[in-house]
Amino acid sequence: MRRTQFRPRAVSDTTARSRRAGRHTKQPADGTGSRKLRSRVLIAGAVIVVAVVAWVGVQLLRPVPPMTLAVSVTTMRVLPGPAPRPDWPGQAEAAVGLPGTGLLGTHGGSQPVPIASLAKIMTAYLVLSGHPLSAGASGPAITVTAADASAYASDQRQGQSVVRVTRGETLTERQALEAMLIPSGNNIASLLARWDAGTEGAFVAKMNARARSLGLRQTRYADASGADPATVSTAADQFRLTLLALQIPAFRQTVAMAQVTLPVAGLTYNVNAALGHDGITGVKTGSSSQAGGCLAFAAARTVAGSQVTIVGVMLGVRATATQPSELDGVISASENLLSSVGGDLEHVQVIRPGTVLGNVSSAWTAGSAAVAATGIAVTAWPGTPVTVTVTPRPLGRRAGPP
C-alpha cells in the first residue's frame, strides 16, 4: 500500500479550498508558493524545537533544591574501660595527651611558672615559620657577628648553657637550630632572634604575639632562651605549642638527634639523657634554680599496627635526696608518667560502616537514611570522651555534564 506524503497533501488542500471559493489561484510555475509554505512550516517547527530545548536547558541548569540533614547518631560517647591513672610528679605542673585526641589530663594547677629552655620551642617554631626548611635543606647562611660572639662570652661567664661560636663563623639555619635545640645553647637562641627580627627585643615581641594568636593565654616571653625567669607558661600551654612544633618536619627531626657536629663547637650531645629510650623521640629539656626541672617529651607507641605519639610536659620538678639534679629528676618523673599511661592506649571503632547517621530530607521527598560509607576509629585511652561530628558535604551539584 502506498503512503501519502504529507507535503504534497498540504499543497493540494490549499488548491482545493481556492477552487471551492470560486477563486482559482494559479501557482507560479517556478514553485515559489510551495517553497513559501514549506518555509512557514519549517520555521514554526524550529520555533517549537527551540522552545523545547530552551525549557529543557532551564530545567537542567536549575539549582538543586536545598536538602537538610537531621543527625540522629549519638554525638558524645566515652570509650569503654577504666581510665588510666597517671603517675603525676608530686607538686610539679604536668600535662599529657595525644595529637588529635588532646589532653588526657593535667596536674599541679595552672599558674604560669618559669619554663627555662622550653622557651626555645617557640623560638624554633617562629624561625621555622618564617624561614621554612625543606627535607635535606640547610637553609641560608648566618654569619656570627661581634655581638653574637660577645653574647657567647657573657652567657658563659654567667654559667648559662652555651655553644661556642667565634666572630666571622658561618652557621646554616639548620646548624643554628641544631645548636639551640640539641646542646641547648642560650646564646644561639639570641643569635637566631637577632637574625630573624634584627634585635632580640623585636623577636620577643613576635613570640608574645604568636602566643596570643595561638590562644596560649598563660604564656609570656621575656627572652628567646628562657634564661630570664620572667619567661613563664603552663604545662597545658606548652603541651599545645609542642604539638604544633612537632608538625614541622625540620623541628621533629632536630629534637630527635642525639648529637651534632658544629663548625667551631665540634661534636656536641643532646642534653636529654632519655632520648632513644622507651620510644622517646624528643623534645626539649630545661632547668634553672627558678624554674626547676622542665621537660617537653614525645614518645612513640604502636597500637593496632599504627604508630602514635604520646606528648607530655612537666614544669617545676625540684631536686630531692634521691634525685639531686633537677634535670635528672624531671627526666625520671617523665619516665614514670609515660610508664603509667603508655600501655593503656586502645584502637576503638566509634562508627562502623553502615551506621545510620541521620535522615536526609528535601522538598520533594520524605527523607532517606544517611549512612556511614566507611568506619571511623580512634586511638585513645579508655574513658576518653569522644565527640562525633557529622558534617555533610554539599548535597548535589549543578546538573549537566561533569
Regions found by a protein language model. Name each.
Residues 5, 9, 57-64, 340-402:
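Conserved SxxK-family serine transpeptidase/carboxypeptidase catalytic domain
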Residues 104-114, 159-162, 281-285, 294-295, ...:
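N-terminal post-signal-peptidase region of extra-cytosolic proteins
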Residues 42-57:
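Hydrophobic membrane-insertion alpha-helices, especially the h-region
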Residues 146-157, 262-269, 360-367:
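Short, mixed-charge aromatic SLiMs
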